């Protein structure tokens, strides 16, 4: 029974990451009507940027903030230079562009960092958390808490901020939201 509970917690941690990525895909699609097939590769590229900063001696939270800034700027550049020019194009054109971005990000990351997996340091301690006779990886517990915190922040953003409410209105009824 202990192993089953450990595996459930580990599965929840991994599933939380997949759920967050799926939520990001849905949010982008609702806002732009574009399915970004390169989203995973863009996240991988940002992770490698963080890994590079950590290996250069930047503290963990400094690398985290630096990665967020660089990923945001990179996303803005990709949206303005690559996605926006094909915004009104047929859907197949947009799919081809995002698939092209996928290949480009993957190839550039492989060229810079090679195609060998790299170990990424965890911000959580390596010692397991013990609850009775059951041991949980602190990384799994940390992933679950971080995912819940991020989801709560996203929920509050869309529920209580003017920008979040406007984005919900635009996603629900684009024509009516343009009139307001």
Identify the meaning behind each predicted range:
Residues 1-32, 37-170, 178:
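Small-residue-rich transmembrane alpha-helical segments that form helix-helix packing/gating elements
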């Amino acid at each position: 029974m202990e192993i089953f509970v450990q595996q459930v917690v580990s599965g929840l941690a991994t599933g939380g990451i997949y759920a967050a990525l799926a939520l990001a895909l849905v949010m982008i699609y609702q806002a732009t009507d574009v399915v970004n097939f390169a989203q995973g590769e863009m996240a991988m590229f940002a992770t490698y940027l963080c890994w590079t900063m950590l290996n250069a001696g930047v503290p963990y939270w400094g690398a985290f903030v630096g990665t967020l800034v660089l990923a945001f700027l990179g996303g803005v550049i990709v949206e303005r230079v690559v996605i926006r020019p094909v915004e009104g194009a047929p859907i197949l054109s947009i799919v081809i562009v995002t698939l092209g971005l996928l290949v480009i990000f993957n190839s550039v990351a492989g060229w810079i960092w090679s195609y060998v997996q790299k170990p990424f340091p965890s911000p959580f301690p390596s010692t397991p958390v013990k609850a009775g006779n059951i041991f949980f990886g602190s990384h799994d517990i940390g992933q679950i808490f971080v995912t819940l915190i991020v989801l709560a922040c996203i929920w509050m953003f869309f529920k209580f901020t003017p920008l979040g409410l406007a984005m919900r209105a635009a996603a629900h009824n684009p024509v009516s939201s343009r009139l307001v």
